[in-house]
Amino acid sequence: MTLTDSDKAAVVALWGKIAPQANAIGAEALERLFLSYPQTKTYFSHFDLSHGSADLANHGGKVVNALGEAAKHIDDLDAALSTLSDLHAYNLRVDPGNFKLLSHTIQVTLAIHFHKEFDAATQAAWDKFLAEVATVLTSKYR
């Protein structure tokens, strides 16, 4: 799936609105992930996963800010995400299917927070962008 110029513009434009709320949006997306797909909690046994926890806000912020870095380097996702790809493939060994689940909960969260901006074209662009990110993050899996 190749991102068009209009897809890239939509991702970058919405990122500008997401950035100031990165921790809150990330925490909400993770909380939604854990509620909808409880099996994903296994990677976070050392976290406080309760609503409003600092762990959710901190890690959610890391996830969303990593997407921001990807958006800033949207034409070279491989280089921008290389370190994270190594981390997820070799150290964390996250089930690759979980990236699709997280992609879904991120999109739901974005739709709730940015209902006017997150129209069909923007949602399609973010869906493609998150799929590209997931492809890069799982590219080093064996």
UniProtKB/Swiss-Prot annotation:
Record flagged with keyword Iron-sulfur: no
Pfam families: Globin
Cellular component GO terms, alphabetical: blood microparticle; haptoglobin-hemoglobin complex; hemoglobin complex
Record bears the keyword Metal-binding: yes
Top-level taxon in the UniProt lineage: Eukaryota
InterPro entries registered for this protein in UniProt: Globin, Globin-like_sf, Globin/Proto, Hemoglobin_a-typ, Hemoglobin_oxygen_transport, Hemoglobin_pi
Disulphide bonds in the chain: none
UniProt-annotated binding residues for heme b: H88
Transmembrane spans: none
GO biological process, one term: hydrogen peroxide catabolic process
Tissues showing expression: Red blood cells.
Binding site for O2: H59
UniProt KW keywords: Heme, Iron, Metal-binding, Oxygen transport, Transport
SUPFAM superfamilies associated with the record: Globin-like
Record-annotated Globin domain positions: 2-142
GO molecular function, one term: oxygen carrier activity
Protein family: Belongs to the globin family.
Purpose of the protein: This is a larval (tadpole) alpha-globin.
Alphabetized PANTHER family for the sequence: HEMOGLOBIN FAMILY MEMBER, HEMOGLOBIN SUBUNIT MU
Subunit structure: Heterotetramer of two alpha chains and two beta chains.
Protein name: Hemoglobin subunit alpha-3
Naturally occurring in which organism (per UniProt): Xenopus laevis
